[in-house]
């Protein structure tokens, strides 16, 4: 399963849907995240002044054995295509920069994507959580 920044942040920040997202991650055989999404998540986490948030991020990545996948040239092209098809200003899904890399990784590995919100549900990506 591919993990988007939104899902990981919801767990780290103890948001309302944390139990559902955490359960999906624990039940997955393998968890992957694009290096671009990992950095995106780290930037958000590091903006919090609470050191416990940073510790939760680092610990969670270790406990879940989250695989940080390098961005390939193919991912770069897929991310651009995702932006052209589903990005802000192009489509109601309004995928942002990070979303496009999560999309590309899900396509590369042909794995469902765990995310929070409704942006990806308006694309052709397979969601990890079904409605």
Task: Label every model-predicted segment.
Residues 1-33, 46-59, 129-131:
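Short, well-structured N-terminal submotif of metal-dependent ribonuclease cores
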Residues 18, 38, 54, 76-80:
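A general structural signal for well-ordered alpha-helical segments in protein cores
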Residues 22-23, 59-62, 83-89:
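Glycine/charged-rich beta-loop-alpha catalytic/anionic-binding loops adjacent to active sites
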Residues 29-32, 65-69:
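Short loop->beta-strand "edge-of-pocket" segments that line small-molecule binding or catalytic clefts
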Residues 44-47, 65:
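Helix-loop "lid/cap" segments that line or gate small-molecule binding pockets
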Residues 67-112:
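Active-site neighborhoods of divalent-metal-dependent phosphate/nucleic-acid chemistry enzymes
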Residues 103-131:
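Acidic, PIN/NYN-like endoribonuclease modules and their adjacent C-terminal/linker elements
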């Amino acid at each position: 399963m591919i993990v988007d920044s939104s899902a990981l942040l919801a767990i780290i920040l103890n948001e309302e849907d944390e139990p559902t997202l955490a359960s999906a991650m624990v039940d997955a055989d393998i968890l992957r995240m694009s290096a671009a999404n990992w950095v995106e998540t780290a930037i958000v986490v590091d903006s919090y002044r609470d050191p416990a948030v940073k510790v939760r991020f680092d610990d969670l990545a270790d406990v879940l054995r989250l695989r940080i996948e390098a961005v390939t040239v193919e991912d770069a092209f897929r991310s651009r295509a995702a932006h052209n098809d589903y990005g802000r200003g192009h489509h109601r899904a309004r995928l942002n920069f990070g979303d496009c890399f999560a999309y590309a990784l899900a396509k590369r590995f042909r794995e469902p994507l765990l995310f929070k919100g409704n942006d990806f549900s308006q694309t052709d990506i397979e969601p990890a959580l079904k409605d």
